[in-house]
């Protein structure tokens, strides 16, 4: 590679603009590039300059779409993930993977996996309950690679932190007067975790955004929901299943949150809207409506079985102000298909790509089991 004879700062500037998938292909062929790809300074600088992708996880593979080029990278899921369901939390290109053992004595298994490098490490998790809540991040007052795992047991009313370097679990105290009802709806941002949560108590539940600060090891409510989290009746099979509006939480502009919502109106029309917050570090955090459109014929109607089978769609707002959405959309009674959408801020569909043809929507085994916004990286899992 002749360009590697250029000054090192010029070479790095070029490589920072090169997708990590391309660097991985070239890494074995060049000693200088190999050394850079193992240099933590370069790895984290490249990560901070990399663009977001969207990821969908299946039982046997993951798919990562580049929303700008529409290229899709398909990688196999480790054979060790021997379960019919599992979900993930993304942090710096690493995935905290949780799946449930088979049989009567069911408990969670945990592993940290980098799909790009293939590195995989298991985390001791004996007797973790299937309803436990997890988080994945790092303390901002220490080294960037000091990754930690949060575990919350509502049943045992206990909280623990796992340090990936020391490989030890450590308990800490917290008040658990809230619950996260959809743990697959998690957002990692700047080392911390964010979820959609509900208060617990005798009174009417209030929906709000809960956070966990890995530096202070404390939970903190960030803000309330921008609207009443309405519950509607939806007919499923021979019964009535109670579901909320389709809601997706995501990050926005590095230090803010965004919220996607699709609701069914009384006249069988659908409204799609996106809300964004100011900086989550501000003293008062509030929502502003970013986007709203009602019954646009080109926009998808999300698969109504999404939350029943954990197929939560994923989205983010691109720097061009477009909404990047990868979802299962309704495709006739009992069926869905998977499509990627780039939606302009006026509701126009700029790009659409069907990534999976029509399939049965109510629990098909080969369908997506989890999804997230993902930034590919070569970040190593701590030894």
Curated annotation (Swiss-Prot):
Any single Pfam family the record assigns to this protein: FBA_1
Cystines in this chain: none
InterPro entries tied to this protein: F-box-assoc_dom_typ1, F-box-assoc_interact_dom, F-box-like_dom_sf, SCF_F-box_component
Positions of the F-box domain: 1-47
PANTHER family reported for this sequence: BNACNNG10540D PROTEIN, F-BOX PROTEIN CPR30-LIKE
Name by which UniProt lists this protein: Putative F-box protein At1g77650
């Amino acid at each position: 590679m002749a360009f590697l004879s250029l000054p090192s700062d010029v070479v790095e500037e070029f490589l920072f603009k090169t997708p990590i998938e391309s660097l991985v292909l070239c890494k074995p062929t060049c000693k200088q590039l190999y050394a850079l790809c193992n240099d933590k300074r370069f790895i984290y600088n490249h990560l901070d300059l990399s663009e977001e992708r969207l990821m969908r996880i299946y039982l046997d593979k993951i798919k990562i779409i580049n929303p700008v080029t529409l290229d899709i990278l398909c990688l196999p899921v480790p054979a060790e993930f021997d379960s019919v369901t599992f979900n993930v939390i993304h942090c710096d290109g690493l995935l905290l993977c949780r799946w449930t053992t088979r049989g009567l004595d069911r408990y969670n298994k945990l592993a940290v996996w980098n799909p790009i490098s293939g590195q995989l490490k298991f985390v001791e998790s004996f007797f973790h309950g299937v309803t436990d809540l997890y988080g994945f991040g790092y303390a901002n007052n220490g080294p960037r690679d000091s990754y930690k795992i949060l575990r919350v047991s509502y049943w045992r009313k206990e909280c623990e932190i796992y340090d990936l370097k020391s490989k030890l679990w450590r308990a800490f105290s917290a008040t658990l007067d809230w619950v996260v009802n959809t743990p697959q709806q998690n957002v990692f941002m700047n080392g911390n975790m964010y979820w959609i949560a509900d208060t617990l108590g005798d009174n009417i539940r209030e929906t709000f955004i809960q956070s966990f600060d890995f530096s202070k090891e404390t939970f903190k409510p960030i803000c309330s929901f921008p609207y009443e989290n309405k519950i509607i009746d939806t007919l499923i099979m021979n019964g009535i299943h109670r579901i909320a509006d389709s809601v997706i939480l995501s990050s926005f502009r590095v230090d803010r949150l965004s919220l996607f919502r699709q609701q069914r109106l009384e006249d069988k029309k659908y409204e799609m809207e996106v809300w964004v917050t100011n900086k989550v570090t501000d003293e008062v955090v509030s929502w502003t409506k970013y986007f709203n459109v009602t019954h646009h014929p080109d926009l998808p109607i999300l698969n109504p079985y999404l939350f029943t089978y954990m197929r939560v769609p994923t989205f983010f707002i691109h720097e061009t102000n477009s909404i990047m959405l990868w979802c299962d959309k309704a495709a006739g009674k009992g069926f869905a298909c998977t499509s990627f959408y780039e939606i302009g801020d006026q509701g126009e569909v700029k790009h659409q790509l069907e990534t999976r043809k029509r399939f049965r929507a109510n629990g098909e085994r080969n369908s997506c089991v989890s999804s997230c916004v993902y930034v590919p990286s070569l970040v190593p899992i701590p030894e």
